Amino acid sequence: MHPGIYETVLRWIPEKSRVLDLGTGDGAFLARLVQTRRVTGEGVEKDSALVARCVERGLTVHQSDIADGLDQYGDNAFDFVLLLGTFQELISPAEIIREAFRVGREVIVSYSNFAHVRVRAQILFQGRTPVTRSLPAPWYRTHNLHFLSLLDFQEFCRDLGVRETNRACFNARGAVRFLPNFRAEEAVSLLQANSILSHSITVERGEAKKETYQI
């Protein structure tokens, strides 16, 4: 992942925020958030070896996949939920985003841009699934399940009822502001739920409480 993404997320998250990092990895970035932004941070990671690395860093990390990991948190438990480098690996990204907004106020998502000029060129001239700096693994070894462009992600947010309040795009040369869907290799977006999604989540919470009372 481009280092500019990490620097951007550091700027977006205020000090002393409550942060949940989904797909924590070895915990290096979450530890940096704790140290530099003084956040209260927790993580979810399914790889036991990586969880052990997180524990060595003094982090609170739960071993679970992302879908099951979110179930253990109550409503509005966090200010920010992070999906950095894991969004395209999700089986049901819309469901995870909705659940992330249940437990958090804002969601930060990073993803690779499948409409980058090099990706287009490899498909057009080579007729093969592209391999690039941001998509380094061949199709049979990649963890990615979804291949999307910046425009696709914008449409996804609109369909889901989510506002993209900020976005930063990057390629090998640095930040990209002009023609990002064509020139950017990676992007990170700051998301907020609009009133429609917020109402839907609130209704679902109410229905869940009713079912609990009936039991």
Q: Which sequence ranges carry the predicted segments?
A:
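S-adenosyl-L-methionine-dependent methyltransferase catalytic module, highlighting the catalytic core
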Residues: E95-E99, E106-I201, G206-I215
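Class I SAM-dependent methyltransferase SAM/SAH-binding core
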Residues: R32-T60, D65-G69
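Class I SAM-dependent methyltransferase "Motif I" SAM/SAH-binding loop
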Residues: G23-G25
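Glycine-rich SAM-binding Motif I of class I
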Residues: G27-A31
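Short conserved loop adjoining the S-adenosyl-L-methionine
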Residues: G69-D75
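Conserved alpha-helix/loop element of class I SAM-dependent methyltransferases that forms part
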Residues: M1-K16
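A short SAM/SAH-binding and catalytic strip from SAM-dependent methyltransferases
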Residues: F80-I91
